[in-house]
């Protein structure tokens, strides 16, 4: 299954890069909830991360850098092309991560960008999951003491970085046997095009890489990690893991420091706790990320999940959502996030 592994670890970053080249046609639901809060500001796109602090929203605009939204006005406050997420540290500083090929953690203070750690080198030297060496830092959360948690999607790992740039790994996520039914349906088996004909011969179930796309710190202090689930892009197979704070070198699936708190979602791309304590989980598309890549996107969702019971309810449906964040009063999400000229931020609750 070497081909499947290569697709699974690189699929997300490649898909997002490809989609910026054309407009995806989707149902008109981008104004679900309270409507756009980004006003006339035109993002370079794609939009990946969203954070809230001090009455402002901060958007990781992969085509430009970090954008601050306040009172319906947008301003680029730090140039950082390739940025995939931001996490405020205090009222003047934040962490930001970049995906492949840069693969770094940065600190931004009053608009000045400084390097903290080269995460790609850590993957090359340590390779926590022992698989193919690949790194695509995708999400970041700030911790006390100047530390940061980073979800590395291609490395299938949660990393922790000290303020001095020292990197260690917290946990790796396991493969899982998943159904190939959704893949075969999307590519049109048994009459798939030549590039996808191999999919029609796959068994009913194959191992899928987890693809750690998201991390959030819960009200209980625990660390929560969401998984996309890579090739073959199954539906209802993405999970959210709870990891005990302070954990190091855990292999989730066998370690007592990891437990699954949410199951049955599809292509998770972001996590964030709301003002009410619910875990907000973003699914980029209900038919999986592969549906988006193949131009068959339906709608994505933002869910509110109870991490005690595992129950989730849909807050809203949106086209191509990639991120969610909450202030003390409201919750916001990105929509049409991968489409140049159309990407924006909406209030959903």
Segments (PLM) and residue ranges:
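Short, conserved, GDST-rich strand-edge loop motifs in beta-rich repeat architectures
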Residues: 97-103, 181-189, 202-205, 224-239, ...
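Secretory targeting and sorting signals
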Residues: 2-32
């Amino acid at each position: 299954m070497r081909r499947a592994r290569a697709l699974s670890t690189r699929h997300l970053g490649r898909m997002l890069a490809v989609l910026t080249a054309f407009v995806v046609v989707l149902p008109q639901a981008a104004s679900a909830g309270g409507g756009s809060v980004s006003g006339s500001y035109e993002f370079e796109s794609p939009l990946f991360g969203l954070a809230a602090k001090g009455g402002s929203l901060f958007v990781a605009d992969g085509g430009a850098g970090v954008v601050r939204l306040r009172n319906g006005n947008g301003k680029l406050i730090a140039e950082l092309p390739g940025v995939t997420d931001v996490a405020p540290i205090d009222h003047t500083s934040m962490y930001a991560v970049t995906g492949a090929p840069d693969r770094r953690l940065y600190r931004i203070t009053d608009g000045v960008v400084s390097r903290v750690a080269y995460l790609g080198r850590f993957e090359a030297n340590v390779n926590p999951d022992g698989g193919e060496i690949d790194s695509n830092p995708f999400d970041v959360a700030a911790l006390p003491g100047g530390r940061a948690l980073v979800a590395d999607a291609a490395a299938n790992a949660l990393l922790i970085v000290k303020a001095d740039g020292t990197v260690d790994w917290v946990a790796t996520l396991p493969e899982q046997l998943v159904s190939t039914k959704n893949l075969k349906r999307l590519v049109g088996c048994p009459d798939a095009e030549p590039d996808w004909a191999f999919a029609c011969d796959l068994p009913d179930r194959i191992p899928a890489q987890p693809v750690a796309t998201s991390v959030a710190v819960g009200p209980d202090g625990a660390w929560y990690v969401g998984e996309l689930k890579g090739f073959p892009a199954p539906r209802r197979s993405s999970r959210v893991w709870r990891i005990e704070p302070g954990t190091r070198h855990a292999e989730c699936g066998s370690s007592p420091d990891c437990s699954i708190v949410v199951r049955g979602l599809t292509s998770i791309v972001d996590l964030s706790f709301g003002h009410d304590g619910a875990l907000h989980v973003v699914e980029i598309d209900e038919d999986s990320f592969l549906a988006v890549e193949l131009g068959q996107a339906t709608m994505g969702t933002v869910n509110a999940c109870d991490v005690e019971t595992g129950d989730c309810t849909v807050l809203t449906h949106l086209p191509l959502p990639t991120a969610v964040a909450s202030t003390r009063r409201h919750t916001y999400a990105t929509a049409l996030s991968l489409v140049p000229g159309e990407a924006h931020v909406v209030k959903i609750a």
